[in-house]
Amino acid sequence: MKKDDIRRTVRARKSLLTENEKAEAAQSVFDRLEQMAAFMMADRILMYHSLPDELSTRDFLGKWSGRKHFFLPRVNGVNLDILPYEQTRLHLGAFEIEEPDGNDLTDIADIELIIVPAVAYDRHGNRVGRGKGYYDRMLAGSRATKVGVGYDFQLIDDAIDTDSHDVPVDIVITQSHTVIRRR
């Protein structure tokens, strides 16, 4: 399936969600994540700070930030820097996403688990992002377990057309499904 078609379809589905449906979905997805060995064993986790149309990460970050070391990406040109998450040290950055302040950069090799946002995922772990390639460039240098999270309708049955630079996730979690990619 073509990425632009997927983006249009998913955007339309997201626009129909109520705030209550969004909150229930986020709770369900992150409850599932908390039960996974990859999460339980990880201490250094790269998260994302959600956009309004994405599965919200705010409550999850608040719940676990005292027990796990979280990091957030910050746009730097065409790449993403990784910085420690401190709720009081965020500013509105590129694409109107809250990003960490400071210069305390972390190497991707030091991250044990990466929670990856996307527009959609297929059952092979392939993902459709927003089209800029930020996450693909960053994920290419990582050996960490990569977990994609989203709404049920973001997990599609059709195979996603991929390019040579696309980096799949290892696990996809939605409200009703957990898909583990075979390597």
Question: For each predicted feature, which ranges?
Answer:
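Conserved residues at the C-terminal ends of beta-strands
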Residues: 48, 117, 175
